[in-house]
Every structure is written in structure tokens, then in C-alpha cells.
Amino acid sequence: MAITQERKNQLISEFKTHESDTGSPEVQIAILTDSINNLNEHLRTHKKDHHSRRGLLKMVGKRRNLLTYLRNKDVTRYRELINKLGLRR
């Protein structure tokens, strides 16, 4: 199921770095992580949905690139985000 606008606004308010922040790496990674988790649940029940699986792989790759960017830019923000989201990196 797609991420709702209310859930997206909740993630933005939780991970924003300043008042009008909607596009910082932290916000983008949080939204992608939520979408990835939702898509994982979908794929557990619909194992043959290869079209959605490709979308999942694209989202995981995009999140990985954003995490690498954030790690190179500011390690402390990267570590805080990883702990907050519960990612394994």
C-alpha cells in the first residue's frame, strides 16, 4: 500500500532539520524506509509480483545512495538516523 499523506507529514515533522524542511537526506531516507517496509509486507503475501519487486530494488538503491551521501557529509547525523530508523548499517 502506498504511503499516505498523513504518514508522510508525520515522518517529515519527525525527521526535519529546520522548520520548512521537506527534502533533507534524513527526511528522504525516512520516507523511503517507510515505503520499503510497506512494500516488503505486500511482497510477503504476493510473491510473484515482480513489477513491485523491481520498484522495491530501485527504492533500496536510492536509499543506499542517500545514506552514503549523508555518511560522507556528516557522520554524526548519519549515525543518529541509523539508530532512529533501526537500520543495520
UniProtKB/Swiss-Prot annotation:
Superkingdom field? Bacteria
**Region Disordered, residue ranges:** 1-23
User: Which GO MF terms are attached to this record?
Assistant: rRNA binding; structural constituent of ribosome
Positions with biased composition (Basic and acidic residues): 1-21
Q: Which GO terms describe its biological process?
A: translation
* The keyword Transferase is assigned to this record: no
Q: Which GO terms describe its cellular component?
A: cytosolic small ribosomal subunit
Matching InterPro entries, A to Z? Answer: Ribosomal_uS15, Ribosomal_uS15_bac-type, uS15_NS1_RNA-bd_sf
Q: What's in the keyword line of the UniProt record? A: Ribonucleoprotein, Ribosomal protein, RNA-binding, rRNA-binding
Report the PROSITE patterns cross-referenced here: RIBOSOMAL_S15 (PS00362)
Q: Does the keyword Transport apply?
A: no
Family per similarity comment: Belongs to the universal ribosomal protein uS15 family.
> Which proteins does it associate with, and in what oligomeric form?
Part of the 30S ribosomal subunit. Forms a bridge to the 50S subunit in the 70S ribosome, contacting the 23S rRNA.
Name this protein carries in UniProt: Small ribosomal subunit protein uS15
Q: What is the lineage of its organism?
A: Bacteria, Bacillati, Bacillota, Bacilli, Bacillales
